[in-house]
A protein has these predicted regions:
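Expand to "…catalyze enediolate/carbanion chemistry for C-C bond making/breaking, isomerization
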Residues: 169
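Cofactor-pocket helix-loop regions in the catalytic cores of large enzyme subunits
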Residues: 1-157, 163-164, 181-336
């Protein structure tokens, strides 16, 4: 699923140890030095058990924990209940294999933790991701080359959306509540800092709550079908009628959400629009349209720019081609 990253692993001259946690014997698992075939939905228990084992091995970085974390004592007390016998029974993984994984992490000078949609869109996703991050933090495996808690995106150009304003108001790595960071982004974009909100946009659950409370009266849904594919479908579907206006912008007009819309905006498909995407090497790839979009369909960004012109903020979009030049200013890993 992520050939660029895995090929980097294969080319590593230091022959790193690769531990794969997956119920399935995938190609990645078969190429790993250690495969932990956990039972579905048991990742969280495994991670807590490994955390307990690392504490027992003295593999915690006390200076890093002291200077850069909070709540470690509470976490250590919590995972103390996850002994190897309990973890093995819950995960179906032999104690010896779990011990091998803990030993490898404890002995590693540079340990990197990677996960993708199997965690982020799986059972107890938030807690499982937090458990992975906790392993990186408690061992000090973060902030140095070859380390890190790395959540790898799952869909094409999902990384692009994160780098360029996944919070709808700031570039990635910036804090919307920090005036200095808002000033920096405004300078890069060449716009008035007052145009940048001082708070992040709303998450899905907050949007649903906003519809229910009446705070949100109109909703514009782009390239997704929450009436079918998102969590708590029954609640969301029941709230759609509470909106004064539902706009759906999508390639398909017959999705469950599109059929409920007051206004449908037909979008161009991937082969019908120019654009770019960003891959795991931070390279920006150029995409050119193979054909014209049919009928009234148009690229999403053209719709956004048109609306911006009508709202009087069109000039803020006219320098969009130069955004990437300043996006990574001050970063050690610039987008190329």
């Amino acid at each position: 699923a992520h050939p660029i990253l895995f090929e980097r692993l294969q080319r590593n001259p230091h022959c790193p140890e690769v531990i794969v946690v997956d119920p399935r014997a995938t190609e990645t698992a078969m190429a790993a030095t250690l495969h932990l075939p956990v039972a579905p939905k048991s990742d969280q228990v495994l991670l807590y058990g490994i955390a307990r084992a690392l504490i027992a091995r003295g593999a915690v970085d006390p200076a890093f924990v002291r200077d850069h974390t909070s709540g470690y004592d509470e976490f250590a007390s919590f995972v103390d209940a996850f002994d190897m016998d309990l973890v093995s029974a819950a995960t179906g993984v032999e104690v010896a294999l779990i011990d091998r994984a803990a030993d490898a992490i404890a002995a590693g000078e540079r340990v990197s933790f990677w996960w993708t949609m199997g965690v982020n869109q799986g059972h107890a996703a938030t807690r499982t991701a937090q458990a992975v991050i906790a392993l990186a933090l408690m061992t000090g495996s973060i902030g140095r080359p070859g380390t890190g808690a790395n959540s790898i995106t799952g869909q094409c150009n999902a990384m692009g959306s994160r780098l360029f304003s996944n919070t709808a108001s700031m570039f990635a790595g910036r804090d919307a509540t920090d005036p200095a960071q808002r000033e920096a982004v405004a300078e890069i974009l060449g716009i008035d800092v007052a145009a940048i909100p001082d708070r992040p946009s709303m998450a899905y659950d907050q949007i649903v709550d906003g519809i229910e409370s009446g705070t949100i009266r109109g909703l514009w849904i782009i390239a997704t079908n929450p009436a079918h594919s998102w969590i708590d479908q029954q609640r969301f579907n029941g709230l759609l009628d509470e909106l004064d206006l539902l706009v759906v912008q999508d390639l398909y007009s017959d999705t469950e959400t599109a059929r409920r819309s007051d206004l449908f905006l037909p979008a161009a498909g991937w082969g019908e629009k120019d654009g770019t995407f960003i891959n795991s090497e931070r390279r920006v790839g150029r995409v050119r349209a193979a054909s014209e979009p049919p009928g009234q369909a148009r690229p999403e960004f053209e719709t956004f720019k048109g609306l911006a012109e009508d709202w009087g903020c069109g000039p803020m979009f006219r320098r969009w081609r130069d955004r990437s030049r300043g996006h990574g200013r001050g970063w050690s890993c610039r987008v190329r």
